[in-house]
Amino acid sequence: LLIRKATKKDSGAIVSLFNIIIDEMDLDVIKSLDRSKLDIVFQKSFETQEFLTDWAQTTVAVENDKVVGFLYGYSFENEKRINKLMHSFLKDAGLSPSIVIFSDPEAFPNEWYLNSIAVDPEYQGHGIGSKLLETATIVAAKQNKNKLGLNVDWENPRAEALYYSYGFRNVGLIILGDHNYNHLQKNVKK
């Protein structure tokens, strides 16, 4: 298994994994849109240096030349401009620029926020998610953050238990769409 920084060429595979999370979020705005057009928005986003390395950091797990997992996150202070950049691709994809996909703030101040982490279902249970979580801790430290944060859906207690086993603790509640999430944080050594 190879864990490496994502490149533009990985964007299609990343979008497939990102959609696992999007489906679980069950957002009304997503349900109302043409998903193939929305995939264009996501793909264009994950092709930019801003999403890959500059404002956010995207990492992939690769097995036999296939992207089987990814993580994507950013420092709290970059959240608004990342969302704005993603929204700038709506028109290119044939969607109304007035659509707001992600309106709720997700990150907490002074943290590196793990927005997304997903592993291909065929590859789950082999420690790939754990390796990606370890990588997120390293990325947070490199971004000079002493906290790594993430949101976990109340409907996913298995994931929450996994995060607790990695030293995360519940620091708050956040509502995204119609779902309640616990906001978890872990201290990171710089």
Predicted features by range, described:
Residues 2-16, 24-29:
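A short beta-loop-alpha structural element at the N-terminal edge
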Residues 23-46, 57, 91-94:
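Conserved GNAT-fold acetyl-CoA-binding loop/helix
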Residues 46-60, 77-82, 113:
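A short helix-loop-beta-strand connector motif used in the catalytic cores of GNAT acetyltransferases and
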Residues 77, 149-152, 164-183:
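Conserved catalytic-core motifs of GNAT/GCN5-like acyltransferases
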Residues 77-112:
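Conserved acyl-donor/pantetheine-binding loop and adjacent beta-alpha core of acyl/acetyltransferases
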Residues 110-112, 140-151:
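Conserved GNAT acetyl-CoA-binding A-motif
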Residues 115-124, 150-159, 176-181, 187-189:
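Conserved beta-strand-loop-alpha-helix junction that forms the acyl-donor binding cleft
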Residues 125-139, 161-165:
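Conserved acetyl-CoA-binding loop-helix of GNAT-fold acetyltransferases
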